[in-house]
């Protein structure tokens, strides 16, 4: 008989200020779980992260920079698992992320418009864990994040850069973002076949991902998310959502 037994998981997080500059912070996050499933499969995972983050720093030149450094300790114990190595294993991983943008602002009587070219660079000396068979993809919402695959038990190995553009139109009277458009793409020096094929993440050039959000009123809006193939000749993903608020 098959059964599944999931033990309680845990999450602990603590943030430290390491200097008088409140923009420079160190955080510690520890989380873990263990479970039995499919009769004889066992997984126990503990992940400890130490992260240094400068948050956003605005320079006189107009550039907005953000720097992040991650040290990750992954501890696993498993039997008959397709996700983790057999028995007890320990890994120490590291990754660094630098992001910069150059916001351009045009203020009007009714609206304020922001146009921002965005650049980020990631590097890790570690090899990527094989997640090529997992159903994961990149969106504009996560493409510039450290853990952009939504997993905390590995780091993305090698080096890559991400380039993007973002436009926002803000209503001055209520601060509402009435029009937002963002688009971005990942570039690598080498293929990374340990990453999923979806949205061409394992290729030198990923899909062009983006979103378009229109909120003409407080009660109605349309959100469009897309991924254009890296050959730019067809779409690999489209999703449209309408929001209607009734008072």
List where the protein language model places each region:
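Outer-membrane beta-barrel proteins and related beta-barrel translocases across Gram-negative bacteria
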Residues: 1-247
């Amino acid at each position: 008989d098959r059964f599944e037994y999931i033990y309680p998981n845990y999450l602990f997080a603590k943030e430290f200020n390491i200097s008088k500059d409140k923009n420079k912070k160190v955080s510690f996050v520890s989380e873990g779980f263990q479970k039995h499933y499919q009769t004889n499969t066992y997984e126990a995972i503990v992940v400890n992260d130490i992260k240094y983050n400068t948050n956003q720093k605005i320079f006189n030149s107009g550039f907005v920079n953000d720097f992040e450094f991650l040290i990750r300790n992954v501890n696993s114990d498993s039997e008959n698992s397709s996700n983790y190595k057999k028995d007890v294993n320990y890994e120490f991983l590291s990754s660094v992320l630098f992001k910069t943008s150059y916001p351009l602002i045009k203020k009007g009587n009714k609206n304020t418009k922001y146009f921002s070219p965005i650049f980020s660079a990631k590097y890790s000396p570690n090899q990527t864990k094989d997640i090529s068979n997992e159903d994961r993809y990149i969106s504009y919402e996560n493409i510039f994040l450290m853990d952009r695959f939504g997993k905390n038990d590995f780091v993305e190995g090698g080096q890559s850069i991400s380039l993007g553009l973002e436009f926002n139109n803000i209503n001055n009277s209520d601060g509402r973002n009435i029009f937002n458009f963002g688009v971005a793409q990942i570039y690598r020096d080498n293929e990374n076949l340990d990453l999923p094929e979806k949205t061409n993440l394992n290729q030198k050039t990923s899909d062009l991902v983006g979103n378009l959000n229109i909120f003409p009123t407080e009660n109605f809006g349309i959100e469009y998310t897309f991924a254009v193939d890296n050959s730019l000749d067809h779409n690999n993903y489209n999703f449209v959502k309408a929001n209607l608020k009734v008072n």
